[in-house]
């Protein structure tokens, strides 16, 4: 079974290899059962972003494409999909 924290760490490592720093704040599931993550690209904004999140304001990362992923499935495609989404949010395309 894949732990979502393992996915988070793999995403951070993969993006760092590509020169993109991202800082995760939290994962949550909304009332409709859709999973999201909240993150910021600016390390100095972690505290402020965390406060926004605590007040139920999404900071930079609402991502709901995990609805078809189950914890016992391999997570390679999920890591790749999250990385691709983050890169697109900062205007970088994966040309690999």
Protein language model features and the residues they cover:
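Negatively charged, low-complexity tracts enriched in Asp/Glu with abundant Ser/Thr
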Residues: 1-31
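Short intrinsically disordered terminal tails
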Residues: 1-2, 13, 17, 61, ...
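Acidic, low-complexity, intrinsically disordered interaction modules
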Residues: 22-88
């Amino acid at each position: 079974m894949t732990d979502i924290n393992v996915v988070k760490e793999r995403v951070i490592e993969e993006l760092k290899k590509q020169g993109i720093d991202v800082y995760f704040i939290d994962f949550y599931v909304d009332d409709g059962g859709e999973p999201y993550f909240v993150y910021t690209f600016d390390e100095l904004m972690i505290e402020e972003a965390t406060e926004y999140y605590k007040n139920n304001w999404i900071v930079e990362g609402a991502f709901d494409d995990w609805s078809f992923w189950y914890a016992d499935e391999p997570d390679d495609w999920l890591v790749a999909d999250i990385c691709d989404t983050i890169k697109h949010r900062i205007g970088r395309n994966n040309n690999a």
